[in-house]
């Protein structure tokens, strides 16, 4: 068992700063300075020091402890120390960290070793540091020893208080800016150990909720570079995302594609000829003009919304129609775009699809319609519902009378009036993996029937086993599958003899 003398001393400012220690020493003398403090210890040496069980802590004692950092690792084993408190009382402290043993006893047996220790003590304060704490329980002593070891380790790897302060201030400035008003519940947890004028504080900030803001948005700078997967939340590099057909490189999830990207996927380069591009909606029922006093809608007018999405997507409506070639096979194709008002079907969408089918009927072309829609457009009322019957009528003539080939491709989401009409009228109905396909959405069903809809009930894989459509085809082989289907039904490439 080794014996150590704990005396109070002043460490240099650099070391105090690195360890985050208080500079107040309560007027105690430094190690090796025997004018007063050594005499006080010797005078108080004869005082009776009770054991831990009988020692009274009603009067708070602040123990000024020193460790030689060269010998700090030896504290792991059992040792006995001579300790002097702020009142000048001396007593021996025995503790064993491994066995969690702690005891205080009379210090008289150590006094004979005091002069030799003071003479041999080092005058270099760089090897020492001072730690001030208030202890009133035995468990606090154990915490104190552990904190001393932790402080030593932080000092050894140069993680000083300046670095912590810089990191904290950087994080705070990065997340909690003065101009950001969208951060809520930003609380700071501060733990402190105080003794009079000195204290040690450790602060850490917890952010329970961070909302998006125009002044502060983590994605503002880099949102043009990455696309986040809806399934695994992985980041896909946007530059190569289109070449991968908007399929997540981590989990293989099929993300939404724009109508232009789908046309590029299906149609041979240089063969695309759009139809009815100049056809736009004109708010046929004047949706926001009825009873303006009683109608308290916070939404912008329908015409303004149309203009907004036209600017955002570069499209005139929620569907692109036209003719082109798929592996040199002439086809008529209509592709819905969910980015334009959720792909909702209004009078213009219905008219463009109807004209496409009629054109294919007259030219005996196969038809592909790619569905991505939330259903009928409510801003056009009954006119949007009429499109279901109009498209179905044109499809009947195309399929039943002319015996031509219609392929419907269901992507995520395909719901409402599109599902109830031409979406399910194809001779071959193809679905994409994990596509959300339904007539009424989950929320509508639960609110109407007051029943819980299980997760996955309206996903393509589940519906496939119920016979709702034909194959589930990923995007990679989809063009080849369509090519084989067309040739199987007698539609051959133009350049084939």
Curated annotation (Swiss-Prot):
Annotated compartments? Plastid, Chloroplast stroma
Read off the Pfam families from this record.
Answer: Carboxyl_trans
Please list the residue ranges annotated as the CoA carboxyltransferase N-terminal domain. 225-497
Q: Which reaction does it catalyse?
A: N(6)-carboxybiotinyl-L-lysyl-[protein] + acetyl-CoA = N(6)-biotinyl-L-lysyl-[protein] + malonyl-CoA
GO terms for molecular function, please? acetyl-CoA carboxylase activity; ATP binding; carboxyl- or carbamoyltransferase activity; zinc ion binding
Enzyme nomenclature, EC number: 2.1.3.15
Cofactor list:
Zn(2+)
Enzyme class comes to transferase
Q: Which GO terms describe its cellular component?
A: acetyl-CoA carboxylase complex; chloroplast stroma
Keywords (A to Z) from UniProt: ATP-binding, Chloroplast, Fatty acid biosynthesis, Fatty acid metabolism, Lipid biosynthesis, Lipid metabolism, Metal-binding, Nucleotide-binding, Plastid, Transferase, Zinc, Zinc-finger
Q: Which Gene3D superfamilies match?
A: 2-enoyl-CoA Hydratase, Chain A, domain 1
Q: GO biological process: any one?
A: fatty acid biosynthetic process
Q: How is the cofactor bound?
A: Binds 1 zinc ion per subunit.
Q: In which pathway does it act?
A: Lipid metabolism; malonyl-CoA biosynthesis; malonyl-CoA from acetyl-CoA: step 1/1
- Superkingdom per UniProt: Eukaryota
ZnF C4-type: positions? 229-251
- Predominantly, its location class is plastid
Q: Where does Zn(2+) bind?
A: 229, 232, 248, 251
Subunit details: Acetyl-CoA carboxylase is a heterohexamer composed of biotin carboxyl carrier protein, biotin carboxylase and 2 subunits each of ACCase subunit alpha and ACCase plastid-coded subunit beta (accD).
The UniProt function text for this chain reads:
Component of the acetyl coenzyme A carboxylase (ACC) complex. Biotin carboxylase (BC) catalyzes the carboxylation of biotin on its carrier protein (BCCP) and then the CO(2) group is transferred by the transcarboxylase to acetyl-CoA to form malonyl-CoA.
The family assignment reads: Belongs to the AccD/PCCB family.
What NCBIfam families does the annotation carry? accD
- PANTHER family recorded: ACETYL-COENZYME A CARBOXYLASE CARBOXYL TRANSFERASE SUBUNIT BETA, CHLOROPLASTIC
Fetch the HAMAP family from UniProt.
Answer: AcetylCoA_CT_beta
Q: What is this protein called?
A: Acetyl-coenzyme A carboxylase carboxyl transferase subunit beta, chloroplastic
What species was this sequence derived from?
Answer: Phalaenopsis aphrodite subsp. formosana
Source species taxonomy: Eukaryota, Viridiplantae, Streptophyta, Embryophyta, Tracheophyta
């Amino acid at each position: 068992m080794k014996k150590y003398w704990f005396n109070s001393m002043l460490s240099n400012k650099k070391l105090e700063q690195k360890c985050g220690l208080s500079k107040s020493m309560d007027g105690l003398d430094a190690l090796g300075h025997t004018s007063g403090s050594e005499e006080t210890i010797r005078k108080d040496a004869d005082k009776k020091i009770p054991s831990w069980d009988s020692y009274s802590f009603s009067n708070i004692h602040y123990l000024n402890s020193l460790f030689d950092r060269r010998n700090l690792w030896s504290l792991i084993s059992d040792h006995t120390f001579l300790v002097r408190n702020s009142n000048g009382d001396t007593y021996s402290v025995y503790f064993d960290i491994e066995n969690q043993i702690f005891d205080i006893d009379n210090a008289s047996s150590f006094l004979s070793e005091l002069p030799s220790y003071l003479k041999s003590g080092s005058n270099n304060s760089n090897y020492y540091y001072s730690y001030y704490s208030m202890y009133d329980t035995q468990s606090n002593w154990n915490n104190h020893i552990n904190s001393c070891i932790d402080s030593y380790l932080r000092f050894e790897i140069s993680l000083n208080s300046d670095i912590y302060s810089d990191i904290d201030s950087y994080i705070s400035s990065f997340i909690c800016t003065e101009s950001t008003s969208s951060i809520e519940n930003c609380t700071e947890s501060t733990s402190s150990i105080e003794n009079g004028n000195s204290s040690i504080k450790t602060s850490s900030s917890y952010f329970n909720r961070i909302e998006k803001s125009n002044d502060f948005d983590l994605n503002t700078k880099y949102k043009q570079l990455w696309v986040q997967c809806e399934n695994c939340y992985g980041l896909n590099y946007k530059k190569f995302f289109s070449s991968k057909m908007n399929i997540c490189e981590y989990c293989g999830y099929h993300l939404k594609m724009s109508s232009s990207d789908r046309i590029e996927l299906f149609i041979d380069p240089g063969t695309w000829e759009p139809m009815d591009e100049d056809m736009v909606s004109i708010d046929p029922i004047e949706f926001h003009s009825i009873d303006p006093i009683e109608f308290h809608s916070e939404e912008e007018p329908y015409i303004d919304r149309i203009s907004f999405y036209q600017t955002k997507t570069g499209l005139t409506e929620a569907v692109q129609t036209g003719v082109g070639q798929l592996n040199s096979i002439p086809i008529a194709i209509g592709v819905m775009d969910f980015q334009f008002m959720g792909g909702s079907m209004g009078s213009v969408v219905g008219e463009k699809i109807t004209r496409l089918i009629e054109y294919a009927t007259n030219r005996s072309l196969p038809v592909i319609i790619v569905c991505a829609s939330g259903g009928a457009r409510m801003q056009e009322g009954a006119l949007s519902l009429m499109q279901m019957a109009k498209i179905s009528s044109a499809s009947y003539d195309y399929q039943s009378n002319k015996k031509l080939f219609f392929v419907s491709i269901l992507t995520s989401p395909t719901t409402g009036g599109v599902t109830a009409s031409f979406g399910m009228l194809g001779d071959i109905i193809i679905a994409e993996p994990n596509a959300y396909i339904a007539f009424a959405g989950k929320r509508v069903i639960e609110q109407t029937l007051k029943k819980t809809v299980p997760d996955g009930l309206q996903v393509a894989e589940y519906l496939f086993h119920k016979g709702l459509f034909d194959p589930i085809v990923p995007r990679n082989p989809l063009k080849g599958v369509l090519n084989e289907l067309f040739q199987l039904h007698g539609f051959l490439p133009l350049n084939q003899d």
